[in-house]
């Protein structure tokens, strides 16, 4: 039945014919360059078929015609253009369209990236101009700062509306009151915003300047000169010392290491902690001195800049020799920017700079992030504007459209403009600054820095947390924890027993032999008078330790010293074996941990080159082994091997170690390996199985001849080489099982548990291997012990992706582990289905992810779920992900400051994210929600009073309050108490951390929604009506004092409403209340002319004696109580009948 279901369902015969025509076209064109690699738009084999099984949730996603998936960009554009021609049905229209497209392409055209020829040490020979080698995290420059900031502000409806209102005051017929009444608040808002952006931009400028000003040694004809990183050009010869950052993409020409190779750390580029071995160009490495680089005529041909950090194609040519020397260049001859030199000193020629480097091309441009709260408030202001227009139209309608009604309509729009409060932006921006200050001053999260002060509320709305692994969840330090021999297991507390066995073994070797045959000593020792069991265990320990000390790709490097020539030299093995002088370098931290462990038990690696390695025994004897063959680790084989010959005995041994899934079929039958591997995995240990096989000289010579022939094959070289190696991998002797732990950051487990309880789904995106990522996910409790893990098997085409997605769909409540390659294939065909399924998982682990893939995953989550995302990382490879997320958090740690500098928030440890979210994020959101709604209430209530006042005066467009009263109402009279809400909190910080479930409520957005907004609108209408009608009813005899009466009651009502809203009092809140009340009382003495109806024209001024009477005071108090008391009663009843989640904790 399976082969009856087509892989690509075709809906019509026409579609099928079109598909065959495309296939014929591609066949005719030919493979073209890069045909050996599967491209993004490459056609799949349409003869494949799917198994019979139900499709997933979205049927359309699986039944689309294959033309939707397999059309090349060029073919797609051609098809679109033909459709456009047919649609317009006119040559002149098509000509106009083409001209417009050409103009758009000219205006938006980017510089085309091209391959280049780079002459060594001759930047002036470059044919084209290349970008500056500078790091830029700034959003603006000197010319775009003011326009950019103004655009970012006036794109908000609130600010644009007030700009229009303020400009309308220049029209005499529309003028209401004084100009400063409108322009002063708007100017203040813009000044605060520009100042804040200027400070943030200046800080980014300083950080960029610090990175761009790092000094490097540049090799010239006259010698070495110091040059800034930003001044490096294509063609320069740059010298990079050990532990120094590589400033630009270079081709590796020369090193101080005599082997002609060095190690670099790439964790800031790809997230992998494995050190990468780089090989210098042999032609330049053989030159006697550095200055000889200028005595030859040589150039590098490099491919055009591209995103892929794992590939490079180029050639090195020396044309002053006869015949010219040509060397092919690959990824192992390159030094990418943002990597760190781990050994020796390197010299390279710069081929890419600035935005053409791999690291920058994999980093997205910084964008202006707008918080969800700001977007929600922007929607509410649009609703308020609609209410403003409706109210103005109603007033004009009730006026009977008398006279120039359109002028009255605009005047009403201006009179009620306080429905949309301009002080909203001021209060929110000042609140954000206060939240940032509180975060940086929190002693429980020292070193935390707020770099983007506009989105602190985002910390309280997060649903997805995407985290890096290396250096973020882990300390990036491997520690040897367990050695298992099958019958006996050794842990950290019994390592001294292993050390004793090794010491006794080699001491007896040294005493029983005269250096003639040291390797046979353990066998003779095992035949001594000691018990048989003890001898067996001791012999097995000896063999296991020796295998671990030999089977690796670790190189010991000794501390550098300066030679006579001025070049860096390194201590050789026969010169200096001091332990404090030695460091280990390898492509895997696991291997370094194993070699360090063998050193701790007595067998030390002291020297290694391409042909041999030397071990030092506890007795001080040096054992030399010739390296005959080396089989490096690959993700496909999951194992590595080495064939060595003992120089003392001429014994040839094949050692191998690898993952249990790969080694279980290679080693001899045993009954303990699978069980013990499972036990160690449950402890969070990374396991490796070690085995050996002894070879005779004849066996090795036969293997070597077959292996050499396979390596010379032109076709299927990889498969043939693997087949020859597999002929040795049979019935190998199982020596031991090792367990290594990648130590987690402090308090990672409780922090992840807290985040899960808070309703945050955690995704781990790492460039590391699948096995490593899975192990860390278990040990960190990202995946709980009771949850199953679904490892998404590798897929390469649409059919395989379909099958695997259907298999994954049947799983329930299991974590997903998927590799970057499989992820890209699935996203190419079934993007929506994969994201939908992944979002249902309790945890997701994506391994082997490139920086661009990390950013793409974040973008997909934002687009498909519409939920708030947060990305956290500590390396340069995490910058794109951090910038793509709604909220980016950088950890300043061992991998440098690049992620920290590009993030919105910077912390020093992963565990700090718990308090940052549970306490500061939660408080920031709830405070801003309350502050925003209270400010809108403040504008609505005064607009309601204006509407009542106008209706009393026969719907005349006459202002109730003018001049300083309107400015003071939103500033000195009520601003301090309202702004003091930024100090309010519903529960104590300790409770918020202890009960992270409180955070989960925030993701629903109930603190600020249309429901709560409508409640505040009703409160405003009620209070505004009570204040105005109460003033008119109670003071009918003294109608001339309505302004003073109503305004006084209004101020008291606002102060009481703030007091009723506050849940936790702070001494500054009390000060704010009394300070505002004092300012109002004091202003009555010198602002009496503002409190009369119509002021001078009516001859009405405030009677100071009147406001001091008991009648005035009790009637104002009565109005205020009537406006506030019912609301307090309703609030009290609601808390009793339907208490919020935090009320029990706060009580």
Swiss-Prot record:
EC numbers for this chain: 7.6.2.1
Transmembrane segments: 145-165, 174-194, 383-403, 409-428, 940-960, 963-983, 1013-1033, 1042-1062, 1067-1087, 1107-1129
Organism domain of life: Eukaryota
Cofactor annotation: Mg(2+)
Region (Disordered): 509-536
Positions with a binding annotation for ATP: 468-470, 591, 633, 638, 657, 686-687, 766-768, 848, 854, 877-878
Family affiliation: Belongs to the cation transport ATPase (P-type) (TC 3.A.3) family. Type IV subfamily.
UniProt-recorded name of the protein: Probable phospholipid-transporting ATPase IIB
Species lineage: Eukaryota, Metazoa, Chordata, Craniata, Vertebrata
Gene transcribed to yield this protein: Atp9b
């Amino acid at each position: 039945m399976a082969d009856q279901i087509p892989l690509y369902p075709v809906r019509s015969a026409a579609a099928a014919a079109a598909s065959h025509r495309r296939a014929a076209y591609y066949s005719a064109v030919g493979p073209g360059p890069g045909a050996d690699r599967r491209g993004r738009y490459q056609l799949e084999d349409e003869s494949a078929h799917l198994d019979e099984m139900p499709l997933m949730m979205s049927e359309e996603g699986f039944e689309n015609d294959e033309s939707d998936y397999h059309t090349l960009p060029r073919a797609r554009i051609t098809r679109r253009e033909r459709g456009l021609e047919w649609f317009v049905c006119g040559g002149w229209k098509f000509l106009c369209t083409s001209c417009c497209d050409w103009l758009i392409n000219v205006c938006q055209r980017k510089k085309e990236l091209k391959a280049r020829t780079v002459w060594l040490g001759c930047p002036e020979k470059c044919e084209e101009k290349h970008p500056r080698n500078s790091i830029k995290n700034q959003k603006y420059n000197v010319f775009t700062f003011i326009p950019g900031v103004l655009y970012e502000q006036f794109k908000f409806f609130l600010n644009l509306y007030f700009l229009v209102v303020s400009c309308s005051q220049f029209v005499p017929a529309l003028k209401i009151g004084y100009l400063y009444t409108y322009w002063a608040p708007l100017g203040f808002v813009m000044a605060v915003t520009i100042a804040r952006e200027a400070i943030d931009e200046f800080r980014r400028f300083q950080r960029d300047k610090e990175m761009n000003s790092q000094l490097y040694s540049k090799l010239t004809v006259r010698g070495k000169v110091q040059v800034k990183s930003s001044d490096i050009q294509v063609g320069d010869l740059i010298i990079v010392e050990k532990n120094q950052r590589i400033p630009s993409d270079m081709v590796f020409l020369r090193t101080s290491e005599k082997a002609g190779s060095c190690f670099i750390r790439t964790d800031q580029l790809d997230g992998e902690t494995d050190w990468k071995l780089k090989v210098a160009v042999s032609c330049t490495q053989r030159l006697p001195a550095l200055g000889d680089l200028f005595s030859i005529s040589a150039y590098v041909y490099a491919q055009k800049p591209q995103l892929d950090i794992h590939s490079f194609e180029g050639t090195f040519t020396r044309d002053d020799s006869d015949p010219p020397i040509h060397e092919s260049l690959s990824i192992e001859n390159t030094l990418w920017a943002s990597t760190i030199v781990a050994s020796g000193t390197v010299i390279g020629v710069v081929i890419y700079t600035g935005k053409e480097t791999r690291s920058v091309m994999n980093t997205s441009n910084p964008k202006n992030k707008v918080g969800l709260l700001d977007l929600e408030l922007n929607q509410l202001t649009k609703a308020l504007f609609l209410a403003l227009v409706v109210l103005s139209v109603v007033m004009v309608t009730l006026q009977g459209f008398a006279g120039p009604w359109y002028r009255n309509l605009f005047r009403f729009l201006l009179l009620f403009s306080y429905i949309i409060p301009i002080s909203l932006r001021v209060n929110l921006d000042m609140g954000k600054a206060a939240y940032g200050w509180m975060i940086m001053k929190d002693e429980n999260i020292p070193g935390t820095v707020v770099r983007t002060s506009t989105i602190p509320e985002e910390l309280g709305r997060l649903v997805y947390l995407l985290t890096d692994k290396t250096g973020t969840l882990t300390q990036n330090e491997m520690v040897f924890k367990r050695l298992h021999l099958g019958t006996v297991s050794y842990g950290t507390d019994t390592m001294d027993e292993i050390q004793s066995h090794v010491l006794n073994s080699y001491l007896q070797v040294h005493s029983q032999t005269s250096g003639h045959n040291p390797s046979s000593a353990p066998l003779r020792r095992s035949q001594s008078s000691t018990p048989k069991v003890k001898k067996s265990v001791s012999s097995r320990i000896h063999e296991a330790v020796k295998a671990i000390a030999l089977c690796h790709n670790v190189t010991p490097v000794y501390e550098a010293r300066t030679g006579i020539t001025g070049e860096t030299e390194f201590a050789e093995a026969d010169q200096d074996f001091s332990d404090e002088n030695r460091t280990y370098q390898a492509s895997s931290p696991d291997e370094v941990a194993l070699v360090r462990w063998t050193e701790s038990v007595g067998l030390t690696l002291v020297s290694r080159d391409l042909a041999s390695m030397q071990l030092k025994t506890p007795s001080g004897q040096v054992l030399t082994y010739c390296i005959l063959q080396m089989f490096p680790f690959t993700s496909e084989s999951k194992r590595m091997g080495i064939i060595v010959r003992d120089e003392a005995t001429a014994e040839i041994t094949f050692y191998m170690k690898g993952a249990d899934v790969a080694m279980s079929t290679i080693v001899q039958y045993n009954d303990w390996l699978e069980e013990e591997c499972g036990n160690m995995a449950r402890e969070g240990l990374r396991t490796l199985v070690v085995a050996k096989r002894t070879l005779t000289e004849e066996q090795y010579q036969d293997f070597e001849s077959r292996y050499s022939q396979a390596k010379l094959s032109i076709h299927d070289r990889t498969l043939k080489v693997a087949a020859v190696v597999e002929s040795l991998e049979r019935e190998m002797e199982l020596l031991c099982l090792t367990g290594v732990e990648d130590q987690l950051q402090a308090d990672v487990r409780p922090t992840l548990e807290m985040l899960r309880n808070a309703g945050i789904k955690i995704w781990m995106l790492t460039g590391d291997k699948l096995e490593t990522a899975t192990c860390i996910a278990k040990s960190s409790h990202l995946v709980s012990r009771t949850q199953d893990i679904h490892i998404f098997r590798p897929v390469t085409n649409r059919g395989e992706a379909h099958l695997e997605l259907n298999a994954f769909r049947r799983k329930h409540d299991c974590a997903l582990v998927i590799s970057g390659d499989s992820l890209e294939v699935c996203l190419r065909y079934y993007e929506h289905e994969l994201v939908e399924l992944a979002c249902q998982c309790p945890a997701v682990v994506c391994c082997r992810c490139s920086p661009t893939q990390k950013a793409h995953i974040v973008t997909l989550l934002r687009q498909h779920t519409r939920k708030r995302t947060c990305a956290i990382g500590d390396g340069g490879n995490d910058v794109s992900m951090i910038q793509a997320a709604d909220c980016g958090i950088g950890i300043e740690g061992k991998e440098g400051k690049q992620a920290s500098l590009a993030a919105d928030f910077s912390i020093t440890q992963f565990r700090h994210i718990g308090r940052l979210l549970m306490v500061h994020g939660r408080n920031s959101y709830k405070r801003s929600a309350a502050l925003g709604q209270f400010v809108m209430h403040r504008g609505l209530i005064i607009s309601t009073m204006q509407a009542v006042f106008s209706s009393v005066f026969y719907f005349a467009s006459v202002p109730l309050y003018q001049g300083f009263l309107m400015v003071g109402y939103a500033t000195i009279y009520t601003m301090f108490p309202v702004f003091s809400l930024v100090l309010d909190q519903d529960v104590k910080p300790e409770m918020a951390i202890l009960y992270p479930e409180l955070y989960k409520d925030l993701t629903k957005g109930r603190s600020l929604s249309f429901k709560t907004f409508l409640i505040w609108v009703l409160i405003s209408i009620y209070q505004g009506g009570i204040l105005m009608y109460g003033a008119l009813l109670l003071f009918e005899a003294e109608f001339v004092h309505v302004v003073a009466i109503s305004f006084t009651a209004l101020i008291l009502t606002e102060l009481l409403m703030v007091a009723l809203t506050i849940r936790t009092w702070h001494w500054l809140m009390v000060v704010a209340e009394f300070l505002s009340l004092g300012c109002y009382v004091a202003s009555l003495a010198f602002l009496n002319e503002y409190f009369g109806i119509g002021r001078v024209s009516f001859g009405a001024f405030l009677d100071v004696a009147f406001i001091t009477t008991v009648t005035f005071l009790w009637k104002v108090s009565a109005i205020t109580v009537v406006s506030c008391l019912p609301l307090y009663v309703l609030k009290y009843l609601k808390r009793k009948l339907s208490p919020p989640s935090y009320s029990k904790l706060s009580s």
